[in-house]
């Protein structure tokens, strides 16, 4: 893989998601787990450590491809602060394009910018 062009990547920094109180939608199962299985959060540390195996931020340094990352700053499903935790750990060539007024939705012309980036291959 030489080029990578994620748009609002998912599964970044689960702990940050919890701190932002965004345990709904895709993360609703987390709230359910704590409510039904661990109401005092006695096993919270272990819970997030296990999720670390699939957390993008923990694998970002292994990505060798050139990355063109795009995100909407109003995204509540994949919050930018959680995405930044992965983006900042990328060690190769990278570029980020931010869309201040957009959330987790179709952003005009993003397909064009991705295709322009991928033409480098």
Question: Where are the model-predicted features located?
Answer:
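Active-site nucleophile elbow and catalytic-triad environment of alpha/beta-hydrolase enzymes
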Residues: 42-59
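Hydrolase active-site cap/lid region
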Residues: 1-42, 106
């Amino acid at each position: 893989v030489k080029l990578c062009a994620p748009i609002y990547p998912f599964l970044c920094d689960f702990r940050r998601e919890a701190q932002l109180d965004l345990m709904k939608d895709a993360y609703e199962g987390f709230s359910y787990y704590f409510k039904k299985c661990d109401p005092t959060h006695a096993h919270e540390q272990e819970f997030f450590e296990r999720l670390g195996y699939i957390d993008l931020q923990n694998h970002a340094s292994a990505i060798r491809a050139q990355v063109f990352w795009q995100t909407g700053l109003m995204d509540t499903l994949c919050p930018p602060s959680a995405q930044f935790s992965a983006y900042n750990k990328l060690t190769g060539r990278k570029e980020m394009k931010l869309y201040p007024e957009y959330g987790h939705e179709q952003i005009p012309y993003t397909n064009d910018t991705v295709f322009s980036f991928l033409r480098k291959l």
